[in-house]
Protein backbone atom coordinates (compact mmCIF):
# COMPACT_ATOMS: atom_id res chain seq x y z
CA UNK A 1 0.00 0.00 0.00
CA UNK A 2 1.20 3.50 -0.86
CA UNK A 3 0.53 6.17 1.76
CA UNK A 4 1.10 9.82 0.88
CA UNK A 5 1.18 12.63 3.44
CA UNK A 6 1.50 16.31 2.57
CA UNK A 7 1.81 19.13 5.09
CA UNK A 8 -0.24 21.91 3.50
CA UNK A 9 0.62 24.42 6.19
CA UNK A 10 1.46 24.53 9.88
CA UNK A 11 -1.96 23.43 11.07
CA UNK A 12 -3.11 21.08 8.33
CA UNK A 13 -1.88 17.96 6.61
CA UNK A 14 -3.66 15.64 4.18
CA UNK A 15 -3.24 11.91 3.60
CA UNK A 16 -4.29 9.38 1.00
CA UNK A 17 -3.79 5.61 0.81
CA UNK A 18 -3.58 3.68 -2.46
CA UNK A 19 -3.23 -0.07 -2.87
CA UNK A 20 -3.34 -0.28 -6.68
CA UNK A 21 -1.13 2.38 -8.29
CA UNK A 22 2.23 0.66 -7.66
CA UNK A 23 1.02 -2.57 -9.23
CA UNK A 24 -0.15 -0.68 -12.32
CA UNK A 25 3.28 0.78 -13.07
CA UNK A 26 4.89 -0.90 -16.10
CA UNK A 27 8.59 -0.59 -16.91
CA UNK A 28 10.97 -1.73 -19.60
CA UNK A 29 14.14 -2.81 -17.80
CA UNK A 30 17.26 -2.12 -19.86
CA UNK A 31 20.79 -3.53 -19.69
CA UNK A 32 22.50 -0.14 -19.29
CA UNK A 33 24.23 0.73 -16.03
CA UNK A 34 25.99 3.75 -14.56
CA UNK A 35 27.36 4.87 -11.21
CA UNK A 36 25.66 7.57 -9.13
CA UNK A 37 27.11 8.57 -5.74
CA UNK A 38 29.23 5.44 -5.82
CA UNK A 39 26.34 3.03 -6.36
CA UNK A 40 25.77 0.95 -9.48
CA UNK A 41 22.45 1.88 -11.03
CA UNK A 42 20.29 0.11 -13.57
CA UNK A 43 17.94 1.72 -16.05
CA UNK A 44 14.18 1.39 -16.36
CA UNK A 45 11.97 3.19 -18.87
CA UNK A 46 8.26 3.89 -19.12
CA UNK A 47 5.92 6.19 -21.05
CA UNK A 48 3.27 8.22 -19.23
CA UNK A 49 0.92 10.62 -21.03
CA UNK A 50 3.23 10.67 -24.08
CA UNK A 51 6.24 11.51 -21.87
CA UNK A 52 9.26 9.19 -21.85
CA UNK A 53 10.51 8.69 -18.29
CA UNK A 54 13.89 7.08 -17.57
CA UNK A 55 14.73 5.95 -14.03
CA UNK A 56 18.20 5.06 -12.77
CA UNK A 57 17.85 2.94 -9.65
CA UNK A 58 20.05 0.86 -7.37
CA UNK A 59 19.38 -2.21 -5.23
CA UNK A 60 22.73 -2.04 -3.41
CA UNK A 61 21.23 -0.14 -0.47
CA UNK A 62 18.37 -2.62 0.02
CA UNK A 63 15.83 0.19 0.37
CA UNK A 64 13.18 1.45 -1.99
CA UNK A 65 12.16 4.98 -2.79
CA UNK A 66 11.93 7.65 -5.51
CA UNK A 67 11.47 11.42 -5.94
CA UNK A 68 7.87 10.76 -7.07
CA UNK A 69 5.36 7.92 -6.88
CA UNK A 70 6.87 6.51 -10.03
CA UNK A 71 9.36 3.71 -9.39
CA UNK A 72 8.77 3.42 -5.66
CA UNK A 73 8.81 -0.37 -5.86
CA UNK A 74 11.80 -1.12 -8.13
CA UNK A 75 14.64 0.03 -5.87
CA UNK A 76 16.13 3.35 -4.79
CA UNK A 77 15.77 5.78 -7.70
CA UNK A 78 18.75 8.16 -7.80
CA UNK A 79 17.98 9.86 -11.11
CA UNK A 80 14.85 10.58 -13.11
CA UNK A 81 14.94 11.93 -16.68
CA UNK A 82 11.85 13.17 -18.52
CA UNK A 83 11.96 13.40 -22.32
CA UNK A 84 15.73 13.69 -22.21
CA UNK A 85 15.68 17.32 -21.09
CA UNK A 86 14.44 17.45 -17.48
CA UNK A 87 16.58 15.72 -14.86
CA UNK A 88 16.29 15.13 -11.12
CA UNK A 89 19.48 13.66 -9.63
CA UNK A 90 20.33 12.70 -6.05
CA UNK A 91 23.23 14.71 -4.63
CA UNK A 92 23.54 13.00 -1.24
CA UNK A 93 22.46 9.81 0.50
CA UNK A 94 22.02 9.98 4.25
CA UNK A 95 20.83 7.26 6.60
CA UNK A 96 18.09 8.31 9.01
CA UNK A 97 15.97 6.49 11.55
CA UNK A 98 13.34 4.39 9.83
CA UNK A 99 9.89 5.96 9.78
CA UNK A 100 6.77 3.87 9.32
CA UNK A 101 3.83 5.69 7.69
CA UNK A 102 1.52 4.45 10.45
CA UNK A 103 3.80 5.97 13.10
CA UNK A 104 4.07 9.17 11.12
CA UNK A 105 0.30 9.45 11.12
CA UNK A 106 0.03 8.54 14.80
CA UNK A 107 2.69 11.01 15.91
CA UNK A 108 1.51 13.84 13.68
CA UNK A 109 0.78 17.04 15.58
CA UNK A 110 -2.21 17.69 13.34
CA UNK A 111 -5.27 15.63 12.58
CA UNK A 112 -5.22 14.18 9.10
CA UNK A 113 -8.13 12.23 7.64
CA UNK A 114 -7.41 9.77 4.86
CA UNK A 115 -8.84 11.18 1.63
CA UNK A 116 -9.60 9.67 -1.73
CA UNK A 117 -6.85 10.20 -4.29
CA UNK A 118 -8.62 12.86 -6.35
CA UNK A 119 -9.48 15.01 -3.33
CA UNK A 120 -5.94 14.64 -2.00
CA UNK A 121 -4.40 15.77 -5.30
CA UNK A 122 -6.82 18.70 -5.52
CA UNK A 123 -5.95 19.98 -2.04
CA UNK A 124 -2.22 19.59 -2.66
CA UNK A 125 -2.58 21.43 -5.99
CA UNK A 126 -4.56 24.30 -4.47
CA UNK A 127 -2.04 24.68 -1.65
CA UNK A 128 0.53 25.86 -4.19
CA UNK A 129 -1.22 29.17 -4.77
CA UNK A 130 -3.41 31.68 -2.93
CA UNK A 131 -7.12 31.79 -3.70
CA UNK A 132 -9.17 34.89 -2.94
CA UNK A 133 -12.90 34.05 -3.07
CA UNK A 134 -14.80 37.04 -4.47
CA UNK A 135 -18.33 35.85 -5.29
CA UNK A 136 -20.05 32.50 -4.73
CA UNK A 137 -23.35 31.69 -6.46
CA UNK A 138 -24.37 35.34 -6.60
CA UNK A 139 -27.35 36.42 -8.68
CA UNK A 140 -26.99 39.30 -11.15
CA UNK A 141 -30.46 40.22 -12.33
CA UNK A 142 -32.83 43.11 -12.94
CA UNK A 143 -35.20 43.56 -10.03
CA UNK A 144 -36.38 46.28 -7.68
CA UNK A 145 -36.08 43.66 -4.95
CA UNK A 146 -32.28 43.38 -5.31
CA UNK A 147 -30.74 44.52 -2.03
CA UNK A 148 -27.24 44.83 -0.62
CA UNK A 149 -26.07 42.91 2.43
CA UNK A 150 -23.08 43.10 4.76
CA UNK A 151 -20.62 41.77 2.17
CA UNK A 152 -22.18 42.22 -1.28
CA UNK A 153 -23.34 45.60 -2.55
CA UNK A 154 -25.91 45.72 -5.36
CA UNK A 155 -26.53 48.60 -7.73
CA UNK A 156 -28.42 49.41 -10.95
CA UNK A 157 -31.42 47.25 -10.02
CA UNK A 158 -29.18 44.27 -9.28
CA UNK A 159 -27.17 44.24 -12.52
CA UNK A 160 -23.98 45.23 -10.64
CA UNK A 161 -22.56 43.41 -7.63
CA UNK A 162 -19.63 44.84 -5.67
CA UNK A 163 -17.38 43.58 -2.90
CA UNK A 164 -14.53 45.11 -0.90
CA UNK A 165 -11.50 42.83 -1.20
CA UNK A 166 -8.14 42.99 0.57
CA UNK A 167 -5.29 41.67 -1.55
CA UNK A 168 -2.05 40.26 -0.16
CA UNK A 169 1.27 41.81 -1.08
CA UNK A 170 2.18 40.30 -4.42
CA UNK A 171 5.84 39.72 -5.25
CA UNK A 172 7.46 41.01 -8.42
CA UNK A 173 7.34 37.67 -10.24
CA UNK A 174 3.91 36.46 -9.05
CA UNK A 175 1.12 35.89 -11.56
CA UNK A 176 -2.54 36.80 -11.00
CA UNK A 177 -5.53 35.08 -12.59
CA UNK A 178 -9.25 35.75 -12.57
CA UNK A 179 -11.74 32.85 -12.78
CA UNK A 180 -15.47 33.28 -13.29
CA UNK A 181 -18.22 30.67 -13.71
CA UNK A 182 -21.60 31.70 -15.18
CA UNK A 183 -24.99 30.05 -15.56
CA UNK A 184 -28.33 31.40 -16.68
CA UNK A 185 -30.82 31.81 -13.86
CA UNK A 186 -33.63 32.77 -16.20
CA UNK A 187 -32.20 35.06 -18.90
CA UNK A 188 -32.04 33.34 -22.30
CA UNK A 189 -29.96 35.97 -24.11
CA UNK A 190 -26.28 36.65 -24.67
CA UNK A 191 -25.28 39.63 -22.52
CA UNK A 192 -22.29 41.88 -22.00
CA UNK A 193 -20.40 41.21 -18.78
CA UNK A 194 -17.55 43.10 -17.16
CA UNK A 195 -15.35 42.46 -14.13
CA UNK A 196 -13.83 45.68 -12.83
CA UNK A 197 -12.15 47.39 -9.93
CA UNK A 198 -12.80 50.93 -8.75
CA UNK A 199 -9.71 53.15 -8.36
CA UNK A 200 -10.06 55.46 -5.36
CA UNK A 201 -6.84 57.44 -5.52
CA UNK A 202 -8.47 60.66 -6.78
CA UNK A 203 -10.99 63.12 -5.39
CA UNK A 204 -13.90 61.37 -7.09
CA UNK A 205 -14.42 57.69 -7.91
CA UNK A 206 -16.97 55.62 -9.78
CA UNK A 207 -18.31 54.50 -6.40
CA UNK A 208 -19.74 58.01 -6.00
CA UNK A 209 -21.79 57.45 -9.14
CA UNK A 210 -23.03 54.08 -7.93
CA UNK A 211 -24.12 55.53 -4.60
CA UNK A 212 -25.38 58.94 -5.76
CA UNK A 213 -26.38 58.39 -9.37
CA UNK A 214 -24.65 58.45 -12.76
CA UNK A 215 -25.45 62.16 -13.16
CA UNK A 216 -22.84 62.94 -10.47
CA UNK A 217 -19.99 61.51 -12.57
CA UNK A 218 -17.80 63.67 -14.85
CA UNK A 219 -19.33 64.22 -18.27
CA UNK A 220 -17.61 63.61 -21.60
CA UNK A 221 -18.92 65.37 -24.72
CA UNK A 222 -17.56 65.21 -28.25
CA UNK A 223 -20.05 67.25 -30.25
CA UNK A 224 -22.66 64.61 -31.10
CA UNK A 225 -25.16 66.12 -28.67
CA UNK A 226 -24.99 63.42 -26.00
CA UNK A 227 -23.44 63.36 -22.55
CA UNK A 228 -21.43 60.34 -21.42
CA UNK A 229 -20.99 59.86 -17.67
CA UNK A 230 -17.84 58.56 -16.01
CA UNK A 231 -15.98 57.11 -19.01
CA UNK A 232 -12.75 59.16 -19.23
CA UNK A 233 -10.08 60.14 -16.72
CA UNK A 234 -9.77 63.70 -15.46
CA UNK A 235 -7.42 65.32 -12.98
CA UNK A 236 -9.93 64.49 -10.22
CA UNK A 237 -11.53 61.25 -11.48
CA UNK A 238 -10.33 57.78 -12.48
CA UNK A 239 -12.63 55.54 -14.55
CA UNK A 240 -13.18 51.86 -13.88
CA UNK A 241 -10.32 49.44 -14.52
CA UNK A 242 -11.77 46.56 -16.54
CA UNK A 243 -10.15 43.30 -15.48
CA UNK A 244 -12.14 41.18 -17.94
CA UNK A 245 -14.90 41.65 -20.49
CA UNK A 246 -16.97 38.56 -21.06
CA UNK A 247 -20.19 37.56 -22.78
CA UNK A 248 -22.80 35.19 -21.48
CA UNK A 249 -24.04 32.45 -23.79
CA UNK A 250 -27.66 31.91 -24.71
CA UNK A 251 -29.31 30.40 -21.64
CA UNK A 252 -26.72 27.89 -20.41
CA UNK A 253 -28.13 25.39 -17.86
CA UNK A 254 -31.52 27.11 -17.46
CA UNK A 255 -32.50 26.19 -21.02
CA UNK A 256 -30.67 22.88 -21.33
CA UNK A 257 -34.05 21.17 -21.70
CA UNK A 258 -34.04 22.31 -25.35
CA UNK A 259 -33.15 19.20 -27.31
CA UNK A 260 -31.25 19.06 -30.59
CA UNK A 261 -29.80 16.01 -32.27
CA UNK A 262 -26.21 15.26 -31.16
CA UNK A 263 -26.10 18.33 -28.89
CA UNK A 264 -25.14 17.67 -25.25
CA UNK A 265 -25.21 21.10 -23.60
CA UNK A 266 -22.63 22.22 -21.07
CA UNK A 267 -24.02 23.19 -17.67
CA UNK A 268 -21.73 26.15 -16.95
CA UNK A 269 -19.34 28.40 -18.83
CA UNK A 270 -15.86 29.10 -17.42
CA UNK A 271 -13.91 32.29 -18.07
CA UNK A 272 -10.26 32.72 -17.09
CA UNK A 273 -8.04 35.75 -17.61
CA UNK A 274 -4.45 36.63 -16.73
CA UNK A 275 -4.69 39.93 -14.82
CA UNK A 276 -1.03 40.25 -13.84
CA UNK A 277 -0.99 43.62 -15.65
CA UNK A 278 -2.96 45.06 -12.71
CA UNK A 279 -0.60 43.85 -10.03
CA UNK A 280 0.34 47.34 -8.83
CA UNK A 281 -3.34 48.32 -8.57
CA UNK A 282 -4.08 45.30 -6.36
CA UNK A 283 -1.00 44.31 -4.35
CA UNK A 284 -1.42 45.02 -0.64
CA UNK A 285 -4.53 47.14 -1.23
CA UNK A 286 -8.17 47.03 -0.24
CA UNK A 287 -10.30 47.77 -3.29
CA UNK A 288 -13.83 47.36 -4.58
CA UNK A 289 -14.14 44.57 -7.17
CA UNK A 290 -17.36 44.33 -9.13
CA UNK A 291 -19.14 42.34 -11.81
CA UNK A 292 -21.77 43.62 -14.23
CA UNK A 293 -24.06 41.69 -16.56
CA UNK A 294 -26.42 43.85 -18.59
CA UNK A 295 -29.88 42.28 -18.52
CA UNK A 296 -33.54 43.02 -17.87
CA UNK A 297 -34.48 39.59 -16.56
CA UNK A 298 -35.77 38.94 -13.03
CA UNK A 299 -33.99 35.58 -12.88
CA UNK A 300 -30.87 36.92 -14.53
CA UNK A 301 -27.59 35.08 -14.15
CA UNK A 302 -25.65 33.23 -11.45
CA UNK A 303 -21.88 33.65 -11.08
CA UNK A 304 -19.00 32.53 -8.90
CA UNK A 305 -15.60 34.22 -9.07
CA UNK A 306 -12.11 33.85 -7.60
CA UNK A 307 -8.80 35.63 -8.03
CA UNK A 308 -5.69 33.50 -7.59
CA UNK A 309 -2.07 34.49 -6.92
CA UNK A 310 0.57 32.11 -8.25
CA UNK A 311 4.26 32.12 -7.29
CA UNK A 312 6.40 32.19 -10.41
CA UNK A 313 10.03 32.25 -11.47
CA UNK A 314 9.16 34.11 -14.67
CA UNK A 315 11.82 36.50 -15.91
CA UNK A 316 9.43 38.40 -18.16
CA UNK A 317 9.16 42.16 -17.56
CA UNK A 318 6.39 42.99 -15.11
CA UNK A 319 4.37 46.22 -15.01
CA UNK A 320 5.19 48.65 -12.21
CA UNK A 321 2.59 51.34 -12.93
CA UNK A 322 -1.06 51.30 -13.98
CA UNK A 323 -2.97 54.39 -15.16
CA UNK A 324 -6.67 54.03 -16.12
CA UNK A 325 -7.52 56.33 -19.03
CA UNK A 326 -11.01 55.41 -20.24
CA UNK A 327 -13.72 52.75 -20.00
CA UNK A 328 -16.75 52.99 -22.27
CA UNK A 329 -18.48 49.86 -20.95
CA UNK A 330 -21.57 51.45 -19.46
CA UNK A 331 -21.97 49.19 -16.45
CA UNK A 332 -24.62 51.55 -15.04
CA UNK A 333 -26.80 51.16 -18.13
CA UNK A 334 -29.72 50.07 -15.95
CA UNK A 335 -29.22 53.18 -13.79
CA UNK A 336 -29.12 55.79 -16.53
CA UNK A 337 -25.52 55.72 -17.78
CA UNK A 338 -25.50 56.61 -21.49
CA UNK A 339 -24.78 53.84 -23.98
CA UNK A 340 -21.39 54.28 -25.68
CA UNK A 341 -22.57 55.79 -28.97
CA UNK A 342 -19.83 58.44 -28.98
CA UNK A 343 -18.06 56.88 -31.95
CA UNK A 344 -20.75 58.15 -34.33
CA UNK A 345 -18.83 61.46 -34.31
CA UNK A 346 -15.50 61.95 -36.08
CA UNK A 347 -13.88 63.07 -32.83
CA UNK A 348 -14.68 59.74 -31.19
CA UNK A 349 -13.10 59.50 -27.76
CA UNK A 350 -10.31 61.78 -26.57
CA UNK A 351 -8.63 61.71 -23.18
CA UNK A 352 -5.80 63.93 -21.96
CA UNK A 353 -3.37 62.77 -19.29
CA UNK A 354 -0.13 64.02 -17.76
CA UNK A 355 2.96 62.04 -16.79
CA UNK A 356 5.26 63.51 -14.15
CA UNK A 357 8.22 61.30 -15.07
CA UNK A 358 9.48 59.05 -17.85
CA UNK A 359 7.83 55.66 -18.28
CA UNK A 360 9.76 53.13 -20.31
CA UNK A 361 8.20 50.41 -22.45
CA UNK A 362 4.71 51.82 -21.98
CA UNK A 363 1.82 49.89 -23.44
CA UNK A 364 -1.91 50.47 -23.75
CA UNK A 365 -4.16 47.59 -22.72
CA UNK A 366 -7.11 47.92 -25.06
CA UNK A 367 -10.36 45.93 -25.10
CA UNK A 368 -12.86 46.57 -27.89
CA UNK A 369 -16.13 44.90 -28.90
CA UNK A 370 -18.86 46.02 -31.31
CA UNK A 371 -22.57 45.85 -30.49
CA UNK A 372 -25.99 46.84 -31.69
CA UNK A 373 -28.38 46.31 -34.57
CA UNK A 374 -29.13 43.23 -36.59
CA UNK A 375 -27.24 41.96 -39.65
CA UNK A 376 -26.05 45.48 -40.55
CA UNK A 377 -25.24 46.58 -37.01
CA UNK A 378 -21.79 47.08 -35.51
CA UNK A 379 -22.05 43.66 -33.88
CA UNK A 380 -21.95 41.89 -37.25
CA UNK A 381 -19.96 44.32 -39.44
CA UNK A 382 -16.14 44.65 -39.23
CA UNK A 383 -15.12 48.14 -38.09
CA UNK A 384 -11.61 49.57 -38.10
CA UNK A 385 -10.35 50.89 -34.74
CA UNK A 386 -7.76 53.67 -34.98
CA UNK A 387 -5.74 54.99 -32.03
CA UNK A 388 -3.70 58.17 -32.10
CA UNK A 389 -1.35 59.65 -29.52
CA UNK A 390 -0.87 63.42 -29.83
CA UNK A 391 -2.33 63.23 -33.33
CA UNK A 392 -0.03 60.46 -34.57
CA UNK A 393 -1.50 57.06 -35.37
CA UNK A 394 0.02 54.42 -33.10
CA UNK A 395 -2.21 51.46 -33.92
CA UNK A 396 -5.16 50.39 -36.05
CA UNK A 397 -6.88 47.08 -36.61
CA UNK A 398 -10.24 45.47 -37.34
CA UNK A 399 -11.41 43.47 -34.28
CA UNK A 400 -13.25 40.34 -35.38
CA UNK A 401 -14.02 36.83 -34.12
CA UNK A 402 -14.64 34.04 -36.62
CA UNK A 403 -14.65 31.07 -34.23
CA UNK A 404 -18.00 31.62 -32.49
CA UNK A 405 -19.45 28.37 -33.80
CA UNK A 406 -16.93 26.47 -31.68
CA UNK A 407 -18.93 27.46 -28.56
CA UNK A 408 -22.30 26.12 -29.71
CA UNK A 409 -22.61 23.69 -26.77
CA UNK A 410 -22.63 26.63 -24.33
CA UNK A 411 -25.68 28.10 -26.12
CA UNK A 412 -28.82 25.93 -25.80
CA UNK A 413 -31.23 28.85 -26.37
CA UNK A 414 -29.46 30.21 -29.46
CA UNK A 415 -31.93 30.74 -32.30
CA UNK A 416 -31.58 28.56 -35.40
CA UNK A 417 -31.91 30.06 -38.88
CA UNK A 418 -33.16 28.65 -42.17
CA UNK A 419 -29.63 28.67 -43.59
CA UNK A 420 -28.50 25.99 -41.13
CA UNK A 421 -26.66 28.37 -38.81
CA UNK A 422 -27.48 29.34 -35.25
CA UNK A 423 -27.17 32.85 -33.84
CA UNK A 424 -24.22 31.85 -31.65
CA UNK A 425 -22.38 30.60 -34.77
CA UNK A 426 -22.18 34.04 -36.38
CA UNK A 427 -18.89 35.94 -36.50
CA UNK A 428 -18.90 39.12 -34.44
CA UNK A 429 -16.96 42.27 -33.61
CA UNK A 430 -14.34 40.68 -31.34
CA UNK A 431 -16.63 38.57 -29.16
CA UNK A 432 -18.65 35.37 -29.13
CA UNK A 433 -21.50 34.27 -26.84
CA UNK A 434 -19.82 32.31 -24.05
CA UNK A 435 -16.30 33.76 -24.29
CA UNK A 436 -14.10 36.49 -22.83
CA UNK A 437 -12.58 39.08 -25.15
CA UNK A 438 -8.80 39.15 -25.23
CA UNK A 439 -7.13 42.51 -24.56
CA UNK A 440 -4.78 43.98 -27.16
CA UNK A 441 -1.42 45.30 -25.95
CA UNK A 442 -0.45 48.38 -27.96
CA UNK A 443 3.20 49.41 -27.70
CA UNK A 444 3.67 53.12 -26.96
CA UNK A 445 7.42 52.99 -26.31
CA UNK A 446 9.18 55.29 -23.85
CA UNK A 447 6.95 58.18 -22.76
CA UNK A 448 8.68 61.32 -21.53
CA UNK A 449 7.23 63.61 -18.83
CA UNK A 450 4.48 65.79 -20.24
CA UNK A 451 0.87 65.99 -21.36
CA UNK A 452 -0.59 63.57 -23.90
CA UNK A 453 -3.88 63.23 -25.75
CA UNK A 454 -5.09 59.79 -26.76
CA UNK A 455 -7.82 59.52 -29.40
CA UNK A 456 -9.87 56.47 -30.40
CA UNK A 457 -12.02 56.56 -33.54
CA UNK A 458 -14.36 53.88 -34.89
CA UNK A 459 -16.77 54.38 -37.84
CA UNK A 460 -19.89 53.57 -35.84
CA UNK A 461 -22.97 52.62 -37.85
CA UNK A 462 -26.36 54.29 -37.71
CA UNK A 463 -28.94 53.02 -35.21
CA UNK A 464 -30.77 49.91 -36.38
CA UNK A 465 -33.27 47.56 -34.82
Where on the chain are the PLM-derived regions?
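Extended soluble regions of mature proteins
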Residues: 1-124
Amino acid sequence: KLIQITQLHKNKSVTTADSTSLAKQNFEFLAETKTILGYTCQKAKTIINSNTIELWYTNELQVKGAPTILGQNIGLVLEMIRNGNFVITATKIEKIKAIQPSLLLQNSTTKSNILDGVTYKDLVWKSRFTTLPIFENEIINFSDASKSNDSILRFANGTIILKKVTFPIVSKSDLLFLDLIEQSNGDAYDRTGSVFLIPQDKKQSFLDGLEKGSQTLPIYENGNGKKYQGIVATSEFAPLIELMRFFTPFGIKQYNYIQLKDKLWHVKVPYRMDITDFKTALSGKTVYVGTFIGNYDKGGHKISMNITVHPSESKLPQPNYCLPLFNTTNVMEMAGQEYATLFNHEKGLEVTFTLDKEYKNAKLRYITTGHGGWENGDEFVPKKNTLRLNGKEVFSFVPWRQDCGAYRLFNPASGNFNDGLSSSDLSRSNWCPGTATQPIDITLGNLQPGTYTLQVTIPQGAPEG
